[in-house]
Structure formats: structure tokens, C-alpha cells
Amino acid sequence: MNVDNNKGNIPELLWNGTISVRIDYEGNSLAYLANVPRQSYFAQILPNVQRLLAPSIPLSECWLDYNGVPLKWHWPVGLLFDLLTVFDPDTPRAPVLWRIQLRSGLFPTTKILQMETMDTFRTYFFNCLKESDYVRNGSSSGIIALSKAETDTYWNAILNHDYYDFRPIAIKILFSKSKFIPLKIYLGANAPIIQTSAPLGSSLGEFLNKRLPDLFPSCDKFLIVKPVIHGITIFLQSVLDELNRDFCYIDGFLHIVLMKV
């Protein structure tokens, strides 16, 4: 079944993309191994990781760390991987096992949020969804208007990674009436996030040339940096409407990581 009709299978292919992850905890010989969907959150696996590797430590005192950088459990996994590992999508390489550490102790409250329960995650996620809806339409009415059954279906589809329950509601709330496209642009792990919106109808190159002319002096050629979404280098000629339809993350934003050419 193809819920996108003639739109092709790009959204489903991206939905099925995974990252191989190994999570270790100092002093424990066990390791947590999983293929984690790019279109998911570490919040979804953190409780299982904590129960396996550090059962005596409260969940709220645990966090994940990569090379000394605390991982934001409320950011999409694929975004974190692209931003922090900086693996060039266009460079041939062997499959990567992303090695992450589970940490506990003095919580880095200035860098990440504490996760108390899954309800913490749910609240944060729907706030992000309302935020992207507001950028699209000038209000969050699309999310607020969802029935309880639709809201629960959408949430459970994310938790269960069920594309066929997720996509019809996503089409309804994210793509059917958009006036603008919500974007977040990442210049590096330590750089401020550029949160902005783009009008419908323009190309990615045209938008980036206007928004970041020093980095994109050309509308159609990579000269300094290149945009990466879901681990894929995106051509500057790509139409933003199509990127929004096919490459949008589940929180309603187009998250674009800029990598050096």
C-alpha cells in the first residue's frame, strides 16, 4: 500500500532509514545494540537503555553522550547523527556503528533537558509540532483540531514506528494547507540554530542564497558548504515544496545540516 499515491516512496524510504548504534555504560560489560530509525528520538530508547545498563539509577539522572557532547533526547536521531558525526554523505565508507555512552551523575542541565518520563517526551514533541504548525499557517489550529483518536494514533505511530498510521495524519496536518515551510538550519554542533521559514515555490538554492549569501553565493552550485537532510546531500535546484513533502521530519520541520564541501 502506498499512502502517498503518485508521490513515490521517498518518504517511506526515509522513514525506514536506520543508524546502527552501540551504547555502553562504564563498569557494565553489557552493551545496548540497536538499529535506531533516523525518524525517531533517543527518548524512545533511553528507558530501555537505562533498565539494561543502569537499573539502579533513576531515568532522570541518565543521559546519552557522544565524544563528550550530551545528546538531546528531544532532537531527531538522524539530525544528531548528521550534525555530530559530520560523515560526508558523498564519501564512500564502510557501514558505521555509532558508539555512544550512557552517563549518570552530575547532570549537564545547562546543555540538555532531563527526561522524567515518556510523558515529558510527549509534551515536548507536541509543543514542537504546534510550533511548526504555527510557522506553516499562522496558528496551531491544525494540531489543536485533531481528534483525540487522531492524536493518539499519530503518537503511537511514532512510538511504534508505524509509517502507515503516521503518514495519513502527517499529510493532513503538515502538508495540506501550508503557507510557509518551517526550517531549522545547523551550521555546526556549537553554532546557534537558524530557525526560519521559506515561501512556497522557490528552490532551496534560491532560499539559501537570500538567507545565507556568504555561504551560498551561488543558487545552483556548492562552493563552501552543502545542505544535508536525512544523511543525503540535497541539490540546490530542489523545490522546497517537494522537500517539505518528502524530507520533512516528524516534528514538522525541515532540519538542514550544512557541511563543508
Swiss-Prot record:
It is found in: Cytoplasm; Nucleus; Preautophagosomal structure membrane. Disruption phenotype: Impairs atg8-processing. Keywords: Autophagy, Cytoplasm, Isopeptide bond, Meiosis, Membrane, Nucleus, Protein transport, Transport, Ubl conjugation. It comes from the Eukaryota. One of its GO terms (biological process) is protein transport. Pfam families: ATG5_HBR (PF20637), ATG5_UblA (PF20638), ATG5_UblB (PF04106). There is a cross-link at residue 148 (Glycyl lysine isopeptide (Lys-Gly) (interchain with G-Cter in ATG12)). Conjugated to atg12; which is essential for autophagy. One of its GO terms (cellular component) is phagophore assembly site. The keyword RNA-binding does not apply. It is a peripheral membrane protein. Involved in cytoplasm to vacuole transport (Cvt) and autophagic vesicle formation. Autophagy is essential for maintenance of amino acid levels and protein synthesis under nitrogen starvation. Required for selective autophagic degradation of the nucleus (nucleophagy). Also required for mitophagy, which eliminates defective or superfluous mitochondria in order to fulfill cellular energy requirements and prevent excess ROS production. Conjugated with atg12. Interacts with atg16 and atg18. Belongs to the ATG5 family. This is Autophagy protein 5. It comes from Schizosaccharomyces pombe (strain 972 / ATCC 24843) (Fission yeast). The gene is atg5.
